[in-house]
Amino acid sequence: MQQVQLKLKSFDPVYINQLISLLNDVLDTLEIQNSKEIFLPSKIKKITVIRSPHIHKKSRDQFQIKRYKRSMIISFTNIDILHAFLEICKDLHVVGVQIHISVKYHS
């Protein structure tokens, strides 16, 4: 049995939702029912910048970058379906989403 873990990262949750729905459609066409989605905690990075270069040091701007993360775990029993799924994932070009794929093999 093979197990694939997809880690998805994005700055916009809409892009992750689009990719998840696309992957669920691919899994439905390949007739795979052994998948689960895990919501991971989002990270917030805050940056503070001084507005003025010379005076008024108390005047500051604050920005934040929020990174959303999800994980999908999919179990495969047939190696040919696994190869087909990995080829489809390789050809996916979703803007704004970073995909990390790890494959585990259980004998």
Curated annotation (Swiss-Prot):
What is its subcellular localisation?
Mitochondrion
Source domain of life is Eukaryota
Q: Does the keyword Iron apply?
A: no
Query: What molecular function terms (GO) are annotated for this protein?
Result: structural constituent of ribosome
Query: Can you cite an annotated GO cellular component?
Result: ribonucleoprotein complex
Disulfide bond residue pairs: none
Residues of the signal peptide: none
**Keyword annotations from UniProtKB, A to Z:** Mitochondrion, Ribonucleoprotein, Ribosomal protein
**Gene Ontology terms describing biological process:** translation
The protein's matches in PANTHER family, at most eight in alphabetical order, are given as: 30S RIBOSOMAL PROTEIN S10 FAMILY MEMBER
Family named by the database record? Belongs to the universal ribosomal protein uS10 family.
**What is the protein name given in its UniProt record?**
Small ribosomal subunit protein uS10m
Species per Swiss-Prot/TrEMBL record: Prototheca wickerhamii
